[in-house]
């Protein structure tokens, strides 16, 4: 049969799949797939515009391939454009595997809350009981101080501090090596930059090295990105008595049917993995960051990073995004309590903490931070629906769930961000998704 959209006719192959978001129609074209909704309140013409905008990035050579998904009111629009590698012929598909980088952080936070619900962890408990390496912290007198110039921590680091990135240690917004503490982090292979799963040591050794360094700020004083999620991965393993990756698989990935999500890709599935690129700042050209075959995700890592180590597919992450949107339920199974999800997606930062924090100037004027997720607190653009929550991955991915619009959106590319400011493809995806709402 055919289905009309402005200036084009497409042949449709009808499918029915209730696993992720309910029934949908599938339109198959050369090197792309598009799914159109009937009752989602999304304009078909405007969805066509979103495809054209995304296709422009591939046609201009800015990314080799893009996968997008918008799910509203339990119906899906899916689009796959381009190829898995520069100059390649194998197209990106619905089951293409992507390195999701910091989109790992919300999953780590959800896993932590499972243990909080089971009373194996408590939000305001010091982490010293399970992480003695972080007991009796010292704190730098100032960020640029030598490592030996410290004062005692005013209080212990808590589980809540890790979830909200207020442990007093994290990414420093300054050129690498500017401060002694940055140089020490690099020398100890603690890694706060783009994911390098084969580089860090095993979890106990990693935490032991972290424990030799002073904190950068007093616990609870400032939001500092990233490190809290990596520490949570170690904490989850010790609190559960299982390896971190095993806990994620048994308590999240298997119940959510996230069969392609993990810290490495099995050899049999490497042909489905997209190649990862970064941008040479001098030339603006693509350069290889990680290949699929024999790359860093082709074998299990010594350190499964709770801050950025996972790979996934658009459908796998949709299952997680829908669970969060449904306040902890996936189908008939409850993964998290309603109270846990509401706590995770509530802004936890005080005005004083926001005033001295952030990756980008002004970010916390319209956003807050919950447990592992950003939360929109004030609308300032098309996509800034108040209450929308989610996070991005610096290797080229993005996810947000929007309770007000009953919508989940996911963008998957594999061209790394060049700065903390989001790339145009990410901004244009979210603008295009929200401009398509037509009710």
Regions found by a protein language model. Give the residues of each.
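Short, surface-exposed loop or secondary-structure junction motifs
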Residues: 78, 138-386
